[in-house]
Curated annotation (Swiss-Prot):
Enzyme class label: oxidoreductase
Membrane topology: Peripheral membrane protein
Keyword Membrane: yes
Matching PANTHER family: 3-OXOSTEROID 1-DEHYDROGENASE (PTHR43400:SF10), FUMARATE REDUCTASE (PTHR43400)
Cofactor(s) needed for function: FAD; [4Fe-4S] cluster
Effect after changing G536A: Decrease in catalytic activity
Stated family: Belongs to the FAD-dependent oxidoreductase 2 family.
Entry protein name: Digoxin reductase
Extent of the signal sequence: 1-48
Amino acid sequence: MEYGKCRGIERGMGRRDFLKAATLLGATAAGAGMLAGCAPKSASEAQAQTAPAATGGLDPADVDWKYETDVVIVGSGSGGTCAAIEAAEAGADVVVFEKDKAMYGGNSALCGGYMLAAGWSTQEEITGYAGDTGEAFANQMLRWSQGLGNQDMIREACLRSGEAVDWMMDTGRTYEGASPLPPVWSCGDTEADVVPRSVYNHNAYGATEGHMATLKKRAESLSNIEIEMGCEVAHILKNAEGSVIGVQLADGSFAKARKGVVMACASVDNNLEMSKDLGLMQNVWGLTLEGAGLLAPGNPDMDSNTGDGVRMLREIGAELCMQQAVCMNDSIYVGGISDWGMSEILGKDVNIHDSSNIDAILVDKTGRRFCQDDAEWGYVMHECAQAAWKQGFTPDDPTTGYIFYVYDATGAPFFEMKGHTPDTCDTTFSADSVDGLAEFIGCDPTALASEVERWNSFCEAGLDADFGRRANMAPIATPPFYCDVVRPGPMGTFAGAKSNVEAEIIGLDGNPIPRLYGAGCIIGGNVSGAFYFGCGWSITNTVVWGREAGRNVAALEPWE
């Protein structure tokens, strides 16, 4: 693999400052180039060069191609790298353009490298659980989707998930265990759905040792993959027949793709204005609170993920597929994993990463609980966002979006471990009585006290009659009492192109756009619903659909 570098966006710019500069809806070609820090020859020249791209009338013979290759891949994350590997191993020459100057792999390099899967070859060996199937996995995920997204793609991702984990192991990745996803009772889960599918290796994660490092090493072994860092793609190019023939970079140069283009960039993660325009309510809530200083350490996301891919896809007439789901957790890890009784079910201890839910309840600004707060964390964070909007959240006043943990002295050590104390954190408050917390929350003291009393009665009975919570049924009864604001940490949205099980991107006419494929979060709306499906779902889909896109684009005959 060869590396190059062209001018691109500088890392390290503050997110809020960057967002002000990076609202790309309706941006001209010149504007896109300037925002990226690239240098077209002139504004008028850049506009003239790129006008045919948007109308689909570009003549390849009239273009001065700086790059000529078989396959262009936009984005170096897991989806893009999997596509590059498959295309290169099929004999295609590949160029990967990465917007960031320094970080290869995007969000995939920052995540824990979990994969969510069923039926991989070592599942029984490392978990003690036998007989899991992709079909059982698919049935649960389809229920969780609630009919949203592409049902065929969700099912197919689950059916291929075990193969995807095995492929990663063949590539050099190792796994040490797997955790079950906490069930979501409102989506029809039962104890039979508590299966260890979230596979991990906590001794090898991140950019240097984990999932992305494994893929990067394999890509580097292939001489027909070229990586261009700091090269922002600004436009997708189509010819007069409507086929994709390449891309234009933000510096005004052009890259020919003789076989096709794979869009594998992120979604609108850190673009607040675009999130508002697209109605991505959970992301708007998360970005607003994060922008107000309620940061959630440990929930990384690339500042350069600002919706470029969505803008480019709209330019060429791609159909969009957007879901409310956001890969988002908070600094306390609400909805954390426990073994959910699996040791008892199997009659032996199982190798499960246990980070079980905390001794706290979640309440809104009325002082009332609103969800099953021990469910899978993607579901819980979605419910927090929904509760915030229902209570009158407006982005102009972040405090209107506050959701609160309520706990007592028994639960305090866990929060202290996370750095949340009244002395060190201005969103943590303590009082000698539950009534005293109401002033900080801004609710009726009687309502809050009644809710805590009701919760305590559920703990005594061993049954949460309101929402079915089962983990950490601990009463809130030992003073001092605490409340703490939830700090949402957005890590990735799922708004982008509509696609199919061949990883082809669909146009507004309902047909695949010739020679255009997608993988990663830019096609994540197809495999998502109202809430994120849990640790490893994104990475599994990047592997499944990245490989599919790479194989299929490499199999095409060149257009010249």
